[in-house]
């Protein structure tokens, strides 16, 4: 006759704490496992993914209207004409890093209106 799961639970619940510790130790030896490892594996994926709060705005390409894109880059970054032109011509390049989502989306919109291809990461 086989012992049921309920019978095992009843037997364990009637045991003292020391008896349960000895039972666990004996089971670890018998089956070659560790109860601590099982707990660590089960507790591993508890961390929730944090929502990203800082974004990078990347200029992928200047597009057909390079002059308008250079003006938009100057206005957004405060760079001089030569620096903005060099940045636009070296696309793909990071325009701004670590900005808020709203600022990144606003910058992306203004650059796309000027004709640039922009990515927010």
Curated annotation (Swiss-Prot):
Disulfide bonds: none annotated. GO terms for biological process: translation. Pfam families: Ribosomal_L12, Ribosomal_L12_N. Keywords: Ribonucleoprotein, Ribosomal protein. GO terms for cellular component: cytosolic large ribosomal subunit. GO terms for molecular function: mRNA binding; structural constituent of ribosome. Homodimer. Part of the ribosomal stalk of the 50S ribosomal subunit. Forms a multimeric L10(L12)X complex, where L10 forms an elongated spine to which 2 to 4 L12 dimers bind in a sequential fashion. Binds GTP-bound translation factors. PANTHER family: 39S RIBOSOMAL PROTEIN L12 (PTHR45987), LARGE RIBOSOMAL SUBUNIT PROTEIN BL12M (PTHR45987:SF4). Belongs to the bacterial ribosomal protein bL12 family. Forms part of the ribosomal stalk which helps the ribosome interact with GTP-bound translation factors. Is thus essential for accurate translation. HAMAP family: Ribosomal_bL12. This is Large ribosomal subunit protein bL12. The gene is rplL.
């Amino acid at each position: 006759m086989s012992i049921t799961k309920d019978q095992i639970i009843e037997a364990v619940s009637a045991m003292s704490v020391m008896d349960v510790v000895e039972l666990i130790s004996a089971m670890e030896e018998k089956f070659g496992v560790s109860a601590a490892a099982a707990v660590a594996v089960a507790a591993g994926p508890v961390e929730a993914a944090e929502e990203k709060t800082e974004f990078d705005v990347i200029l992928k390409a200047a597009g057909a209207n390079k002059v308008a894109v250079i003006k938009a880059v100057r206005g957004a970054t405060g760079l001089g004409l030569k620096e903005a032109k060099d940045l636009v011509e070296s696309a793909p390049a990071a325009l701004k890093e670590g900005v808020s989502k709203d600022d990144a989306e606003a910058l992306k919109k203004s650059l796309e209106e000027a004709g640039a291809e922009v990515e927010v990461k």
